[in-house]
Amino acid sequence: MAALADDPNKVWTIDELKTRGEQVYNANCVACHQANGKGVPNAFAPLDGSQVVNGDKVHQIDVLLKGQDTPAYPGAMPAWKQLSDSDIAAVITYTRNTWSNKAAENIVQPAEILAARSK
């Protein structure tokens, strides 16, 4: 998605984020989490109905920036910190509004990713 030069202070609409997020998801996430968000049983975690995706967005941001190992899924989630702030915000927003997910905090802006990187 190349957009490391994106302005992290730009405020995106939810539709812009979801459109870009779908592209980011298809390029980087679909191999493990699948097009339907169901993951691969006993290998890669599902995102559809996930507590991480539907919970506190700060935790999901942290997972994308730092990766995560969980005993339930031996396929570890890698860190995606090489993606731009806009791409990470977009893919998180996409997952929080796709499949059966109805996250209360349903939008993430690039500035939130930028702030999380400095923690």
PLM segments and residue spans:
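Extracytoplasmic electron-transfer domains, predominantly the class I c-type cytochrome c fold
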Residues: P46-A104
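Sequence/structural segment immediately N-terminal to covalent heme-attachment motifs in c-type
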Residues: I14-V40, V53-K66
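Flexible coil segments in periplasmic/lumen-exposed cytochrome c-class electron-transfer proteins
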Residues: M1-D15, P78-K81, D85-K119
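Intrinsically disordered, low-complexity segments enriched in polar/charged residues with Gly/Pro
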Residues: A3-L4, N9-K10, C32, D48, ...
